């Protein structure tokens, strides 16, 4: 039991030991685990390690990030002890277009891990956010380290932040929530890593159906920014490449391969 200022007490899992050794023992493949109580950003640290010559499969994990990063230059709120912040690094040596599906794989890995160790069924907001009960509980930032001479991806850095028991979020962070279940952090990290390892080398067809089934967007009225302006549409389907097919207000269809989607409130 942990005391929470002005809020009484919050139950935590028994013996929630969160360190590299505890994470490592439940990982079912050969993977180096580098753990920090606090770090600026697990993605940033992973890229520093790659720059210093790391060429193995490794996992950077932190109990807190002081400068967590999200997509499109946004920050990712990463307070101590209430979430897990991890970066998984693989070296696929593949063409850039073949690495695009890794973000989709990461979403599926997080959802499968949550389903395995809790009773929660998460949903996916295209392209790479995980939601529970209509609120975001996980963000994913995938970055590629490329070789310009060969036009291949030498390393892929997959950053994942999951809110487990975070109760208060700073102003400006909208629609965020937490898993709010009794789960051991090391167990969750290991489960995500195991799923990731299986999926990143799998063909897209192995997991795209799962991604579709867990989508929260299909049939919803949405908008996205195009040429600096809001464009209104209805989400129709996710195609075999993971792109989002939408119907515009004028009846035309369009295929989105990247960008930020917002569900319109009814």
Residue spans for each PLM region:
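N-terminal lobe of the biotin/lipoate ligase/transferase fold
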Residues: 1-116, 138
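Long, positively charged amphipathic alpha-helical accessory segments at protein N-termini or as interdomain linkers
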Residues: 94-122, 132-266
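Short loop/turn and capping residues at structural boundaries
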Residues: 4-6, 125-126, 168
